[in-house]
């Protein structure tokens, strides 16, 4: 299987490098760069690109409407590069010469959807023969700790490109994106495999489909969710594979067929929006709504009004965890429907609870949301981004109750995501100790950090904040290790939240610099003597800028404290008497 950084020479006559969604720039060997043929082809590619990117070169003779936006294209180029377009344009015999023909992209796609950015990326390859870097605003998420190599926006972007490449018949792109998706399957969360499975099924990508089916079959994904999400024949294959290779009974307890049948009836009643039937089935049977995972199922698949009616029955626990360690709010976060989030919070759902791998509902939402949806400013009278609304609602709820952080469930292993989040928090708190020692100590005392053990990573020691295997307790089981690390993470999150609430200016400085220094061991004396002369000079310059910002933040926090002191002084007896005198004179 190809890796994400594998060059694909078949994709580009200019030897473009096709790496992960950051996805690098073009690389040329010295011998290729001096080859006149390669130079000519590179020049041709750049010139053709101008037809797409330069508004002064708008000589298009047709338009393709994508997400309501017309994209100018040149039929001769599309026909030469794609058999689909060649056949499409052959059928057009009577076209008015006074106006450009218009085509709806959604009418070309029998399945799937391709957004505007994905189609422009596809067109760029059609015109230039080169694969450019993925646009970060739609191929990354807004979780600052994520490496973006297998988050949902990264997967969704490649899935869209696969639909476009398959339906519009560009086989070399199909081959390349199939390798990319195969790599995602083993790295991402199992729920993120489902859109990959669907594109593999629709585009008849047998190898990719088999890999997806195998991954889902060996997971603990809920049987009824699988039946809801995938075609019946695929669901049956997954069921048969699970029978052949039974799952671990500790993580997936055995459920009788009779019980499954009763649960199925309850969930079908939810599918039909028949709340009265749901109530009747629950009343007449010995199964509770929690045992059927009814609330989890409803917040994902039911209409928001139906969800509100189900919650009004008060027959389920909104903080109940399913066998995978997800609460109802975690599932609602995947749905990204603000009204459902609010309904759950009104019923007492805890926004600060974690999954077994250390993610809260906000973390889940951020991993699902791309920067375009999160940062785009909505014009007056236009609909806001639902994902952004959900994130704002949950973050406000956490800020209202910053100290309500329950210890999360513990899994038998420590996922990579938990390690990344811990390293981020350790670096942030460590940086706060360097520049705001007094404030950091107060926040750490509130968070009870001293009562937990520092996380320094599990990899062999190399530099900075990496791990030391000699310090590992060999008597500690994986379950104990995960519990210890989750406790540490809760303490660090309490510390950060306390800092945000009571020392806002210092927190703003940390926010600004954490993004820049997240991949550097800044806490190790800033490593001033590492790197080239130019790099060391830049580090010193950035250090001086950081010192200035720290001093400003310290002054602002100090001014805030003085202002609060003055405010409290204004309520003293003497000031009260002055106010009374003024009142009496009036």
From Swiss-Prot:
Effect of disrupting the coding gene: Elevated PR-1 expression level and enhanced resistance to Hyaloperonospora parasitica. The double mutant npr3 npr4 accumulates NPR1 proteins (while NPR1 transcripts level is normal) due to reduced NPR1 degradation by the proteasome; this leads to a reduced growth of the compatible pathogenic bacteria Pseudomonas syringae pv. maculicola ES4326 after inoculation, but impaired hypersensitive response (HR) and subsequent systemic acquired resistance (SAR) induction when infected by the avirulent strain Psm ES4326/avrRpt2.
Subunit comment: Forms homodimers and heterodimers with NPR4 in the presence of salicylic acid (SA). Interacts with TGA2, TGA3, TGA5 and TGA6. Interacts with CUL3A, a core component of the cullin-RING ubiquitin ligases (CRL). Interacts with TGA2 in vivo in the nucleus. Binds to NPR1; this interaction is promoted by association with SA, probably due to conformational changes.
Domain notes: The BTB/POZ domain mediates the interaction with some component of ubiquitin ligase complexes.
Organism domain of life: Eukaryota
Keyword line: ANK repeat, Hypersensitive response, Metal-binding, Nucleus, Phosphoprotein, Plant defense, Repeat, Ubl conjugation pathway, Zinc, Zinc-finger
Region described as Disordered: spans on this chain: 554-586
Induction (free text): Up-regulated following pathogen challenge or salicylic acid (SA) treatment.
Disulfide bond annotation, renumbered to this chain: none
The keyword Repeat is annotated on this UniProt entry: yes
Chain positions with Phosphoserine modification: 10
PROSITE patterns named in the record: ANK_REP_REGION (PS50297), ANK_REPEAT (PS50088), BTB (PS50097), ZF_C2HC_NPR (PS52046)
Similarity field: Belongs to the plant 'ANKYRIN-BTB/POZ' family. 'NPR1-like' subfamily.
Ranges of the ANK repeats in the UniProt entry: 261-291, 293-320, 324-353
Name of this chain's protein: Regulatory protein NPR3
GO molecular function, one term: salicylic acid binding
Predominant localisation class: nucleus
Annotated Low complexity bias: 565-577
Organism: Arabidopsis thaliana (Mouse-ear cress)
Involved pathway(s): Protein modification; protein ubiquitination
GO cellular component terms attached to this protein's record: nucleus
Localization: Nucleus
């Amino acid at each position: 299987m190809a890796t994400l950084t594998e060059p694909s020479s078949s994709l580009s006559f200019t030897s473009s490098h096709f790496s992960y969604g950051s996805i690098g720039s073009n690389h040329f060997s010295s011998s290729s760069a001096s080859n006149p043929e390669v130079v000519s082809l590179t020049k041709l590619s750049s010139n053709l690109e101008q037809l797409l990117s330069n508004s002064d070169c708008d000589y298009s003779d047709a338009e393709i409407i994508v997400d309501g936006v017309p994209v100018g294209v040149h039929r001769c180029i599309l026909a030469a590069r794609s058999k689909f377009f060649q056949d499409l344009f052959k059928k057009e015999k009577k076209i008015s010469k006074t106006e450009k023909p218009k085509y709806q992209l959604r009418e070309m796609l029998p399945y799937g959807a391709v957004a505007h950015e994905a189609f422009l990326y596809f067109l760029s390859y059609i015109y230039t023969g080169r694969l450019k870097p993925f646009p970060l605003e739609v191929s990354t998420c807004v979780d600052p700790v994520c490496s973006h190599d297998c988050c949902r926006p990264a997967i969704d972007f490649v899935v869209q490109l696969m639909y476009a490449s398959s339906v519009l018949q560009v086989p070399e792109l199909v081959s390349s994106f199939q390798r990319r998706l195969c790599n995602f399957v083993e790295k991402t969360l199992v729920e993120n495999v489902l859109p990959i499975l669907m594109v593999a099924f629709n585009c008849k990508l047998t190898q990719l489909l088999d890999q997806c089916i195998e991954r889902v079959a060996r997971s603990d994904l809920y049987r009824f969710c699988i039946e809801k999400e995938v075609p019946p024949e695929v669901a049956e294959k997954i069921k048969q594979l699970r029978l052949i290779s039974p799952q671990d009974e500790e993580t997936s307890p055995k459920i009788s067929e009779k019980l499954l049948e009763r649960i199925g009836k309850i969930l079908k009643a939810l599918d039909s929006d028949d709340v009265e039937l749901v109530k009747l089935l629950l009343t007449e049977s010995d199964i509770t709504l929690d045992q059927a995972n009814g609330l989890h199922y409803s917040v994902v698949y039911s209409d928001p009004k139906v969800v509100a009616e189900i919650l009004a029955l008060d027959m389920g626990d909104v903080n109940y965890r399913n066998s995978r360690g997800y609460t109802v709010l975690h599932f609602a976060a995947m749905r990204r429907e603000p009204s459902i989030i609010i309904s759950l919070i009104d019923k007492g759902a805890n926004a600060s609870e974690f999954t077994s791998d250390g993610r809260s509902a906000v973390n889940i939402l951020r991993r699902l949301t791309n920067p375009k949806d999160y940062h785009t400013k909505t014009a007056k009278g236009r609909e806001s981004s639902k994902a952004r609304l959900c994130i704002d609602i949950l973050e406000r709820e956490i800020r209202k109750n910053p100290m309500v952080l329950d210890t999360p469930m513990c899994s038998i292993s420590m996922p990579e995501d938990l390690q990344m989040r811990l390293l981020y928090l350790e670096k942030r708190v460590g940086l706060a100790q360097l520049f705001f020692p007094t404030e950091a100590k107060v926040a750490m005392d509130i968070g009870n950090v001293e009562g937990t053990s520092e996380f320094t990573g599990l990899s062999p020691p190399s530099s900075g904040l990496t791990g030391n295997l000699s310090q590992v307790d060999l008597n500690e089981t994986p379950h104990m290790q995960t519990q210890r690390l989750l406790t540490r993470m809760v303490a660090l999150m309490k510390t950060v939240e306390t800092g945000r609430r009571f020392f806002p200016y210092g927190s703003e400085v940390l926010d600004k610099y954490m993004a820049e220094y997240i991949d550097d061991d800044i806490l190790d004396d800033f490593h001033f003597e590492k790197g080239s002369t130019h790099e060391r000079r830049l580090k010193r310059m950035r250090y001086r800028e950081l010192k200035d910002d720290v001093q400003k933040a310290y002054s602002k926090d100090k001014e805030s404290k003085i202002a609060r002191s003055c405010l409290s002084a204004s309520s003293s007896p003497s000031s009260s008497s002055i106010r009374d005198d003024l009142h009496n004179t009036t």
